[in-house]
Amino acid sequence: MNSYRVQDLVRNYQIGAPGTITGVAYQASNDAVNAQFNAFEMKLCHTSLDELTDSFTTNYDGNSPEPVSSADPVVFDAAADGWFDMPDFQPFHYDGVDNLLVEVQWMGDNGTDLYTWITNTDTYRLLYHKYLDEDVGFLETIYHRFRITIEFDQTVEEVSWGLIKAGF
């Protein structure tokens, strides 16, 4: 494939709380050895949209996507049903309120197929196009199966130890 660009929408309830995302992995649906993708890049972006539009730019919802992973080339080896991590992942602070837009793109590959598991949904949660310079793509009512690694922000209210001790 000459190039590919895809956006997935992850709903805020699937993540659960604010924190720092330290990794993203996909679940392979086939065995793949030496699957190479050139000029590979992953970006993450907050968005208030609950469903994707057919425009990559509109889906940013006025926010700036942040590059979190890139390699040229990247080579993946994956076992069917196994997870493969994005390379050289840079932390991204997720606000816990918005939905999360996950965008991946590459320019050319070596022809080795690496398929990933998807999940069906009733709303448009995936947008793709085979040309990077096209802003309008093709919508699907599916999304990729991700494993997002996140270090949650403090979720327990700060209280005085005196108040806690007084309760005993």
Question: Whereabouts are the PLM-identified features?
Answer:
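Residue-level detector of functionally pivotal "anchor" positions at catalytic/ligand-binding pockets or at interdomain
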Residues: 150-168
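Beta-sheet-rich sandwich/jelly-roll-like modules and their strand-loop junctions
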Residues: 1-51, 99, 109, 116-153
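Aromatic- and Gly/Pro-enriched, solvent-exposed loop/edge beta-strand patches characteristic
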Residues: 38-123
